[in-house]
């Protein structure tokens, strides 16, 4: 709770800025629904803070381009840097570039590989991925009665979130009451709706039998749903789960197509990242790992989340 309050309650202090502060922001990509909400959350929050300006860049899912952006931020003398990493295994060089210039850096949403060895003026703001896939798979297990066959759609394998959410699935089905569930296919859809649809089309064409689809995010889950419906699948007899609770996912749940998702507070992470960056720029202490909780979303409580992401 202490960590959450640090990220979310600091706004009462930060609104009194008496000088201009420039924060460079490098997003992994602009053409991603969840990351768009995250980016908008940062920009909308910054507008409420006097003298705070964000310079937001699109890395276009290119690691080299993102490192270039970090180097340019350093050269331009920004007060702090926020990074949503393209590749979480490639963050050490970014940390080194910022540290060499003594510019604070905050990673947001995707856990950097060097998270446990970050310099004192660097931090990580996100949600704990040990919760996301666990909440999703536990609910799907419940809906399946603890037995059956599942397909797993993984995000980009270069992202720690994809690896962790997939491991969560394995951990849940490795224990009672879910040991009767087996994985028949597990492939990456790179977080993309189109790739989720293509994978599902291929699985259906191959005649693979399954009872549920477990996706690392909502976009791939929606793609799978589109392919299932195009093939004439009765969605009332199919279980599909995702993560993020995006507006499109909630619409799919209302339509009876998506059974489970997990709310990841994109705007909260964005605000927490800006708060952490400003505090570090002012020489204030920030915990190096700031977590915003995940929350399970089902048809039973969907009304509580319709206006959130």
Where do the model's predicted regions map?
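A residue-level marker of the well-folded mature domains of exported/periplasmic proteins
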Residues: 3-5, 18-309
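Bacterial N-terminal signal peptides
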Residues: 7-15
